[in-house]
């Protein structure tokens, strides 16, 4: 202790005398002289310290002062207040005999963390000569300050970010070389001090850059608000900043709407709904303080640094081991248990831990619903000043982030980063299930719902659930009928801002100088038709993205199937005159429990008029069918419906006639099943789609979509498979094709574990477990689990057979039937029966044939127990029990249980006799009558005792193909197929017209 007594009245000497209880020197004059000397020494020290500080500040550029002044202010206040509290407690415990004046004097010499930092810088300056007593006293006080720092460190968790300062590129370039060196040395020394003190902190990104010799500037470092420091949390694999601009949002309006919704929602709503923080970009209820992780969270499966909450993540830097520190206890400082003795830094509502009380106070504003920062323009309140600054850009129109490639400007930095991926082609977000790449994290999240079946956005009116918030917003407009976006020139109103913008820029407004339809003054805005076209996932700012929306949209279309609506009714709202197949639930039901309840995307060709569908009832319907793209006559009998897969199109608003200006229907193929017609021009004008294909007239909402579509006309297929050389128009089609080579099946069945290469195949397979048949025939009521099956079934009513054999000309209603038939022409028949030697080209035909030898009848009737060798025969037999007669005659109304019987019956009305005898020319309406008649010729031609066998009867197929198979004016009948595979009749189809409103796609 004696070695510390450099001066008679040093603090250590005073403490020793106070503990020993010794009396002061009786000589008052000497004591006063000593005090005066101490005061003089203290003044000299203060002056020297001020000189050192001034010299240091003069050596730093003005921009450095601007970047640090606000940060220093808050740290000094917080550190001074906290250190004063700690020092008072220590002084009371260790030095109870000291007076108030002495403790204040001692506390006043303590240095704040910022001053300590500056002291580190000042230590390099040449020291002013001083006497040995003053130097020893200063060393003693520095030792005491270090002890105080260690004591404070035990009370508070200090991070590198508390003392770190960041520079933007512009600020860094303005620094001189010696200033940059000084900054680098100070930052490295600060980090070394914290590590030497035993703080469990990882190596920050800034220090890692300095060690690698890289420049430590931060891209577009924002100006910190008053009282705040630009800080972040290093998670071991990424440096996660809490700048709200880094949140990836769809567009400006959506982002501000989400911020507003978040501020009005009760705490914990985000966490309960999505497993993330209350504010986008956090794991906890607040985005400004820390990053908490949910239980079991780990690195991204694809290793690409994708956080589940949407915050920007920097990729792994070269030379650093990926994921080495990801799950370390110090990787999430906010999740570490609060230090003992600091209950004031722990939120008593949610339990979050904060390094400073000021941050805790800010965080508690969320729980208290305090919004001290109000917008002067609209009066909206915000919890943080940075939120207000971002909101004010909506009033000022400021877009401070320009694209260096195309010059387009953005309000948010994250939007610029996302937009630049259009130019670079970068797709950093990969699906862990199928490997699909996306330019936005939100697209990846939406895409992954096709694998998980998640529909987190339920409608509060009808209970229907959606996988995207934008789809829910469009759906809710049906309930509210709200059209807030009104054109100032023509008065036409729109539900969506994107539709309104397309209307303004696409020339659809006649009053504004466009060539669009001009509405009458008395016409209401609601008559404009639906504006439910999907603006696309890009939103208004990245509408021309080359491949991002393509992959997401095509994946949704691939897995586009949802839980059925048992009511089978069309949406009664007159505004929604389009067909939505499998969009979840009907009216009044709860959220869908279907494991693959995907939302079917609304397509412009999915119009369905809620009234009748009389086109098939027209007597001359067959004559009006177009050939090679010729337009159909307009007045076909009223409003029609476009049924996807049948190629029938109509005016969706009942104006398809000549008076309605519909312009008629247009078809693009020789047969119904191959047609894909477009809505009438009136409907196109009301959809407000500005991009029109000059070759086929098809319209698109985005220029990029039109450019991709035109590849079909140009024959361009830029995406080629490296294995087989097959080319594709879209990259997503190539990726899907690649699965045939790799054997990848990324879609597993949750019931049986079977895996599929396409989501649509999985969805159809799942319906086999659930028994769903959402596609219902409007003629006979038959249900089907796949749309293709319904389309093929519809041809049984229309008599359409679009698939023709190139060898014999025989036509089929299904491509699979044509494929099986073509095996008959091929020499190769790999499946040969061991009993009779008959060969088959298809395994299914071989299996059916084998049942004739084995007598196997695996399909049994549940009512009578009768067995059948084929499922179709069982279905026909079941109609005998149920009394079902799904095939009505359009002439007399008589109904039949089998289509073949109906075809035979129709010949009684038409007088058709397609089966002719080759010997006498007599004609018959049924093949059985011809076979009976042939027996008379066989008995007459066989002379008794001649020994010659009777002449074999000509094959019905040959007779049917002959020129005499149909008389003049007769069109022939539909092919009559028997169970044995024999077909009778001509290749010409009978004129068959279904009843009024007979055939359309419906949904259970």
Swiss-Prot record:
Residues 158-229 form the KRAB domain. InterPro entries: KRAB (IPR001909), KRAB_dom_sf (IPR036051), Znf_C2H2_sf (IPR036236), Znf_C2H2_type (IPR013087). The modification Phosphoserine is found at residues 10, 112. One of its GO terms (cellular component) is nucleus. A zinc finger (C2H2-type) spans 345-367, 373-395, 401-423, 429-451, 457-479, 485-512, 691-713, 719-741, 747-769, 775-797, 803-825, 831-853, 859-881, 887-909, 915-937. Residues 21-60, 73-95, 132-148, 531-557 have a biased composition (Acidic residues). There is a cross-link at residues 829, 955 (Glycyl lysine isopeptide (Lys-Gly) (interchain with G-Cter in SUMO2)). The modification Phosphothreonine is found at residue 7. One of its GO terms (molecular function) is sequence-specific DNA binding. The keyword DNA-binding applies. It is found in: Nucleus. Residues 1-148, 508-574, 936-976 are annotated as: Disordered. PANTHER family: ZINC FINGER AND BTB DOMAIN-CONTAINING, ZINC FINGER PROTEIN 358-RELATED. Belongs to the krueppel C2H2-type zinc-finger protein family. This is Zinc finger protein 316. It comes from Homo sapiens (Human).
């Amino acid at each position: 202790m004696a070695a510390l007594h450099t001066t008679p009245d040093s603090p250590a000497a005073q403490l020793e005398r106070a503990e020993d209880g010794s009396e002061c020197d009786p000589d008052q004059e000497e004591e006063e002289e000593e005090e005066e000397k101490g005061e003089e020494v203290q003044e000299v020290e203060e002056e020297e310290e001020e000189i050192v500080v001034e010299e240091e500040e003069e050596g730093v550029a003005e921009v450095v002062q601007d970047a640090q002044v606000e940060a220093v202010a808050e740290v000094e206040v917080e550190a001074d207040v906290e250190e004063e509290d700690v020092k008072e407690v220590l002084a009371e415990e260790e030095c109870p005999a000291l007076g108030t004046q002495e403790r204040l004097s001692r506390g006043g010499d303590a240095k704040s963390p910022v001053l300590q930092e500056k002291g580190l810088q000042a230590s390099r300056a040449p020291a002013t000569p001083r006497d040995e007593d003053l130097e020893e006293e200063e060393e003693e006080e520095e030792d005491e300050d270090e002890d105080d720092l260690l004591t404070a460190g035990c009370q508070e968790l200090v991070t590198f970010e508390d003392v770190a300062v960041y520079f933007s590129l512009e600020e860094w370039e303005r620094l001189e070389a010696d200033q940059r060196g000084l900054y680098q040395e100070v930052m490295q020394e600060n980090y070394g001090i914290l590590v030497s003190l035993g703080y469990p902190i990882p190596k920050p990104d800034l220090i890692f850059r300095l060690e690698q010799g890289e420049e430590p500037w931060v891209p577009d470092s924002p100006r910190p608000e008053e009282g705040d420091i630009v800080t972040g949390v290093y998670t071991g694999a990424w440096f996660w900043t809490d700048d709200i601009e880094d949140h990836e949002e769809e567009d400006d309006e959506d982002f501000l709407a989400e911020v507003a919704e978040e501020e009005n929602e009760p705490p914990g709503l985000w966490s309960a709904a999505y497993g993330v923080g209350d504010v986008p970009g956090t794991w906890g209820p607040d985005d400004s303080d820390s990053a908490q992780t949910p239980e079991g969270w780990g690195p991204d499966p694809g290793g690409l640094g994708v956080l589940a909450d949407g915050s920007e993540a920097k990729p792994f830097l070269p030379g650093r081991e990926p994921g080495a520190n990801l799950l370390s206890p110090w990787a999430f400082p906010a999740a570490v248990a609060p230090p003992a003795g600091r209950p004031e830094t722990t939120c008593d509502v949610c339990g979050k831990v904060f390094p400073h009380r000021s941050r805790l106070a800010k965080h508690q504003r969320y729980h208290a619903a305090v919004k001290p920062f109000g917008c002067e323009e609209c009066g909206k309140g915000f919890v943080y000043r940075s939120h207000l600054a971002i909101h004010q850009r909506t009033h000022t129109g400021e877009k401070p982030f320009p694209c260096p490639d195309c010059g387009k400007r953005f309000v948010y930095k994250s939007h610029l980063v996302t937009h630049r991926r259009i130019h670079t082609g970068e797709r950093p977000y990969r699906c862990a299930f199928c490997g699909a790449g996306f330019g936005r994290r939100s697209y990846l999240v939406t895409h992954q719902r096709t694998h998980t079946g998640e529909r987190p956005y339920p409608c509060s009116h009808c209970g229907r659930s959606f996988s995207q918030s934008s789809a829910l917003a469009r759906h809710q407009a049906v309930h509210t009928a709200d059209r807030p976006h009104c054109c100032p020139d023509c008065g036409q109103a729109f539900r969506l801002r994107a539709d309104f913008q397309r209307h303004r820029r696409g020339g659809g407004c006649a009053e504004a100088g466009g060539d669009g339809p001009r509405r009458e003054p008395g016409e209401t805005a609601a008559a404009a038709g639906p504006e439910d076209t999907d603006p696309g996932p890009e939103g208004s700012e990245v509408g021309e993205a080359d491949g991002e929306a393509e992959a997401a949209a095509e994946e949704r279309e691939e897995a586009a199937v949802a839980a059925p609506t048992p009511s089978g009714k069309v949406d009664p709202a007159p505004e929604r005159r389009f067909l939505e197949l499998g969009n979840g639930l009907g009216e009044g039901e709860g959220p869908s429990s279907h494991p693959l309840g995907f939302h079917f995307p609304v397509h412009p060709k999915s119009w369905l008029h809620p009234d009748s569908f009389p086109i098939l009832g027209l007597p001359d319907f067959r004559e009006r069918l177009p050939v090679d793209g010729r337009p159909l006559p307009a007045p076909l009998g009223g409003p029609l419906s476009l049924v996807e897969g049948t190629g029938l199109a109509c005016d969706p608003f009942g104006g398809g006639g000549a008076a309605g200006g519909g312009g008629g229907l247009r078809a693009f193929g020789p047969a119904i099943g191959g047609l894909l017609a477009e809505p009438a021009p009136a409907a196109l004008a009301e959809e407000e789609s500005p991009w029109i294909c000059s070759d086929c007239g098809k319209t698109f909402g985005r220029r990029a979509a039109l450019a991709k579509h035109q590849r079909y006309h140009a024959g361009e297929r830029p995406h080629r498979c490296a294995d087989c050389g097959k080319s594709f128009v879209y990259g997503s089609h190539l990726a899907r094709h690649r699965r045939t080579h790799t054997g990848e099946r990324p879609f597993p069945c949750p019931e049986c574990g079977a895996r599929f290469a396409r989501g649509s195949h999985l969805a159809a397979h799942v319906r086999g477990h659930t028994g769903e048949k959402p596609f219902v025939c409007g003629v006979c009521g038959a249900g089907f689990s796949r749309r293709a099956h319904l389309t093929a079934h519809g041809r049984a009513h229309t008599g359409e057979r679009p698939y023709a054999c190139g060898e014999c000309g025989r036509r089929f209603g299904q491509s699979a039937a044509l494929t099986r038939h073509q095996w008959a022409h091929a020499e190769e028949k790999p499946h040969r029966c061991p009993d009779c030697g008959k060969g088959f080209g298809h395994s299914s035909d071989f299996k059916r044939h084998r049942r004739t030898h084995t007598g196997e009848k695996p399909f049994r009737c549940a009512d009578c127990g009768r067995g059948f060798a084929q499922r179709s025969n069982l279905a026909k037999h079941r109609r005998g029990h149920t009394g079902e007669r799904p095939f009505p005659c359009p002439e007399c109304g008589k109904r039949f249980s089998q289509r073949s019987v109906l075809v035979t019956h129709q010949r009684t009305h038409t007088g058709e006799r397609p089966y002719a005898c080759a010997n006498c020319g007599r004609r018959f309406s049924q093949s059985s009558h011809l076979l009976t008649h042939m027996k008379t010729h066989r008995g007459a031609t066989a002379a008794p005792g001649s020994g010659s066998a009777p002449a074999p009867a000509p094959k019905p197929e040959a007779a049917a193909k002959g020129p005499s198979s149909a008389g003049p004016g007769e069109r022939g009948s539909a092919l009559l197929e028997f169970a044995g595979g024999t077909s009778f009749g001509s290749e010409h189809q009978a004129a068959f017209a279904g009843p009024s409103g007979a055939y359309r796609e419906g949904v259970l």
